[in-house]
């Protein structure tokens, strides 16, 4: 028995399910999770000293790879001055200014501790600002685990095979309206039905928690127009896409300005963090400036601020995203070539340093149902066989993958060689 297996069995006696976030338990692929002890660059090493090419990247934050020297140096400098003060620091201002200079829609920003806190606060703020209660989310889009947003959510809920979760009264979710991603007509119908009651529309502009889905530009433009028409706010949940698909986020790539943007992951450089930002008049509704309350003991933690600032300074460098996009494209092309050589139906797509794939004969994947109809059994076999070859993909077909600036031609070639071997075996 491996040390990973020993640790998982031990963890199950003291931690629910043996993990502190459900997707880590490998429920989506079967088997037992791998326990890791270190990471460097594009690689992870498990507790049994096996090395893997890492395409999870801590679920997105590690765009510079593991233990980037600039991030380590920044955190180390702050660490010896104090890990937390529960009071304002200059680093908070510096990171806020950096984010606002890069994100087109952000004029003011509030730091929080997680993506869940960011989206939860964004919904509360939108309701407070508009004095309306209902909001629209999209089937399969995941916005953290706050009560009102765990309705037809993606990510871990899809991995576990449940549409929502017990413990949330209907009275909390009665104001949550849902539509299919990329379906503007459904959204228009909801606005027509509740013309004076919808406070906001929230979405991942590029969903990464129901597989990897690229939006139709007409869909995003239509949402902006509908929100303007009905005096509702548009929230882009860019916790995953922010500084991942491009230097100015998905909003910069598609030229759509939301009213509120939520961020996380990369802006903490691997440390726990979240944020929400937007128009000055909206953000000024947050306490202590306005009446909408939000607070957090560790919000603006100096270690997270330092790591995030160091990360953003690196990704600002010339050609960073051009190089990252090229590497990610090479990866998806390599996987597609390996599948084609094995005569296995396969679809892959990418944007910036974010990608996804599934085993399907569809030429495009536009929503949750397209991903759900793909071959999950084959995905599970592929995942475990690639893991055995030292390639670590997300342990769920509903999760996007991530490439870092430390991935290069060597890692892509190794991944291709492994995929060709595995897919030929699976097609035999």
Swiss-Prot record:
| The protein's Enzyme Commission number | 5.4.3.8
**Would the keyword Isomerase turn up in this protein's UniProt record?**
yes
Q: What class of enzyme is it?
A: isomerase
Q: Which domain of life is it from?
A: Bacteria
Where N6-(pyridoxal phosphate)lysine occurs, the residues are 265
Location relative to the cell: Cytoplasm
Q: GO molecular function terms here?
A: glutamate-1-semialdehyde 2,1-aminomutase activity; pyridoxal phosphate binding; transaminase activity
GO biological process per UniProt: protoporphyrinogen IX biosynthetic process
Q: Spell out the reaction equation it catalyses.
A: (S)-4-amino-5-oxopentanoate = 5-aminolevulinate
**Keywords from the UniProt entry:** Cytoplasm, Isomerase, Porphyrin biosynthesis, Pyridoxal phosphate
A GO CC term attached to the entry: cytoplasm
Q: In which pathway does it act?
A: Porphyrin-containing compound metabolism; protoporphyrin-IX biosynthesis; 5-aminolevulinate from L-glutamyl-tRNA(Glu): step 2/2
The protein's required cofactors = pyridoxal 5'-phosphate
Q: How the protein assembles, per its UniProt entry?
A: Homodimer.
Q: Which family does it belong to?
A: Belongs to the class-III pyridoxal-phosphate-dependent aminotransferase family. HemL subfamily.
HAMAP family documented for this protein: HemL_aminotrans_3 (MF_00375)
PANTHER family in alphabetical order? GLUTAMATE-1-SEMIALDEHYDE 2,1-AMINOMUTASE, GLUTAMATE-1-SEMIALDEHYDE 2,1-AMINOMUTASE 1, CHLOROPLASTIC-RELATED
Protein name in UniProt: Glutamate-1-semialdehyde 2,1-aminomutase
Q: Which organism is it from?
A: Legionella pneumophila (strain Paris)
